[in-house]
Amino acid sequence: MGVLDGRVAIVTGASRGIGAEIARRFAAEGAAVAVAARTTEAGQSQFAGTIAETAAQIRAGGGTALAIAANLARPADRERIVAETVRELGQPDILVSNAAVTYFTPVEGFTAKQFALMFAVQVEAPFQLAQLVLPGMRERGAGWILNISSIAARHPVIPPGQFAGRGSTVYGMCKAAIERFSTGLAAEVYTDNIAVNALSPTKVVPTPGTIFHHLTSEGAENSEPPTVMAEAALLLCHREPRSLTGRVAYSQELLAELDVPVPLA
């Protein structure tokens, strides 16, 4: 028996990295998982990983998966993700918004198109998806919404002149917005028994994207494997909703607080 038996989950940005790891972990605990992202076939992205591969890995392990090709920047695609999930798997009990588009560019160099795309994928998409799944969650008496954030949402704790993170301002702004959205929505739906949380890695997760941007590397001291985020996400998406809601949580700290071993691989 898995802790998510009978549950239906949507995980966006699930072609690789944190999203794929969360999807596999949820499926291993019994959830039927809809994996959504743009990359459906190898060669469509400069990064390895597709939703077809994630879905195949889940099925190979005996789980249930639905691959949904979608561009999270498009409102119609967000609607289709939920509609296809409902049609093929049932009403979603869990929503994990993980999809991201990132440009590490100083503010002066940002184009209007880049800004709009980042905001659409990282703020508007989680907002609209939450709107779409909330009625079904409320009807069934419970639900779990998890928005993946980043330590970039916090102000740098060192003097500005010593801060080496030039180019992360817009990314951090988007993540700060999603954290405020998460805590505010948690208050709005508390009486409906729906948990809403934001979760960040304690350290940088080596994914194709973070490695490409030279933020970390495999086995680096400043890194943690994606399994840590997946385990923390599981905690926030299966316990009694009112017991863990309104959190801006960090993966390793959350696992330590709840006395859950940190998976290192």
What is the predicted role of each segment?
Residues 191, 198-199, 216-265:
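C-terminal helical subdomain
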Residues 130-131, 183:
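A short, exposed helix-loop element centered on a Lys and neighboring polar residues
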Residues 49, 69-80, 112:
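The beta1-alpha1 cofactor-binding region of Rossmann-like NAD(H)/NADP(H)-dependent oxidoreductases
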